Regions:
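Alpha-helical transmembrane segments and adjacent TM-loop junctions that form the membrane-embedded core
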Residues: 21, 29-39, 43-271
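Classical protein tyrosine phosphatase
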Residues: 26
Length: 271
């Protein structure tokens, strides 16, 4: 990272300078990802009844925000260079770019295998930006070395910025939805209610359905179920939980059984 930054200023290659700044954020992102993953293993307590699982999501949000800020800065610098192209030293840029490409490729492949975790996914996007930065540095140096095309450096940097914008948007969108207790992607509350009424003969009505995610791969749900036979309450709860787990992969649900009428007259409803 330090070597690449120094090389960027010496060679005047924007892709190297941008990549060095991105690598600095990567170091912070990976450290934050590791710290939040360790912290999320702690059990619950009286103040945090769900434990520290959301730390992974919060870390992903911070990582996504840093990606967005970096993409904005890279875009600005690229526009300045496009308006007034500056020469670079192609050979040192090529060497540093090849070294960075190899290192970042190894790290990205390692992180990409754990992409189901939102926090690790956001960290992998940071490294992907570094990988693309190294590749862009190689192309820019070759273009200047053989053709003298000074516009290639800021142009390729702009492409990287656009890719980072897309990655930042995805991570921020997913993490914000989880932090706001939004309905998990792919969940249809109407379908859940209808499935429960169709498959559980004891159920007369399903309402007050609320679904959210504790983390990116841990959905949770609460609902009210109206039944006609109070003696079958335990059976109904077990049946509903089994259906939720089998049909929708929800293994943590809270079911409130009602005989007639709902005691909650106000609030957010899902009928």
């Amino acid at each position: 990272m330090v070597i690449e930054l120094i090389a960027g200023f010496i060679t005047n290659a924007l892709v190297l300078i941008a990549d060095a700044g991105h690598m600095f954020l990567d170091s912070a992102a990976l450290g934050l990802a590791w710290w939040s993953a360790v912290l999320s293993q702690k059990g619950d307590d009286e103040k945090l009844s769900y434990g520290y699982h959301r730390m992974q999501v919060l870390a992903a949000f911070v990582n996504g925000l840093s990606l967005l800020i970096l993409a904005i800065w890279i875009t600005w610098e690229s526009l300045v260079r496009l308006a007034s192209p500056e020469s670079i030293l192609p050979l040192p840029t090529l060497i540093v770019g090849i070294m960075g490409l190899i290192i970042n490729l190894v790290v990205y492949r390692w992180l990409h295998n754990s992409s189901n975790n939102l926090n690790v996914k956001s960290a992998a996007l940071h490294v992907l930006g570094d990988l693309l930065g190294s590749f862009a540095a190689i192309l820019a140096s070759l273009a200047v070395l053989f053709f003298g095309w000074l516009y290639v450096d800021p142009a390729l940097t702009m492409v990287i910025a656009l890719i980072l914008f897309r990655g930042a948007y995805g991570v921020l969108k997913d993490s914000i939805m989880i932090l706001l207790d939004g309905v998990p992607p792919g969940f249809d509350l109407t379908e859940i209610k209808q499935t429960l009424k169709d498959q559980c003969r004891l159920v007369v009505d399903i309402h007050h359905v609320h679904a959210w995610s504790l983390t990116s791969n841990r959905p949770m749900l609460t609902l009210h179920a109206q039944i006609t036979d109070s003696d079958q309450s335990i059976v109904a709860v077990k049946s509903i939980k089994a259906i939720l787990k089998q049909e929708f992969q929800i293994d943590h649900s809270t079911i409130q059984i009602e005989l007639e009428g709902c005691p909650d007259e106000e609030g957010s409803h899902s009928h």
